[in-house]
């Protein structure tokens, strides 16, 4: 049995298969995941698990060069935005942050290698992690 890192086998596999510039979408419980997309639904209750705790574990294994957020998060959910940016910055202070309109975010997410649905229940609690390289 695996002891450390991502213990969910499907998420672990998705991260292991990521290449440079591949994307992984970590989304809230209401986000529309496209039919046929690879997804892991972690929701056990409203708010559980939260976006930040899921992202924190994934960042232990995934090299991230950029994150994409909905620009609506700036007005509707600045607290989560700030906590998320600080969390990502702890792992890599050079991570680029891109804000796009929510409708554009949904379009971009369709090209993600996978989706991880969290129990996040705050508006626009979604992030796309863009994979970097380790060399």
Swiss-Prot record:
It comes from the Bacteria. Keywords: Carbohydrate metabolism, Cytoplasm, Isomerase. The active site is at 20 (proton donor). GO terms for biological process: D-ribose catabolic process. Its EC number is 5.4.99.62. Substrate binds at residues 28, 102, 124-126. Signal peptide: none annotated. One of its GO terms (molecular function) is monosaccharide binding. It is found in: Cytoplasm. Its main location: cytoplasm. GO terms for cellular component: cytosol. It catalyses: beta-D-ribopyranose = beta-D-ribofuranose. Catalyzes the interconversion of beta-pyran and beta-furan forms of D-ribose. PANTHER family: D-RIBOSE PYRANASE. Homodecamer. Belongs to the RbsD / FucU family. RbsD subfamily. This is D-ribose pyranase.
């Amino acid at each position: 049995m695996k002891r450390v890192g991502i213990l969910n086998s499907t998420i672990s596999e998705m991260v292991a298969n990521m290449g440079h510039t591949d994307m992984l979408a970590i989304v809230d419980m209401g986000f529309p995941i496209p039919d046929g997309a690879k997804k892991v639904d972690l929701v056990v209750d409203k708010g559980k698990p939260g976006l930040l705790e899921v992202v924190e574990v994934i960042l232990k294994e995934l090299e991230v060069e950029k994150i994409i957020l909905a620009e609506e998060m700036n007005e509707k959910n600045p607290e989560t935005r700030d906590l998320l940016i600080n969390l990502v910055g702890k792992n890599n202070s050079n991570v680029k942050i891109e804000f796009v309109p929510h409708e554009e975010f949904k379009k971009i997410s369709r090209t993600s290698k996978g989706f991880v649905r969290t129990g996040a229940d705050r508006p626009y609690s979604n992030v796309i992690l863009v994979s970097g390289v380790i060399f």
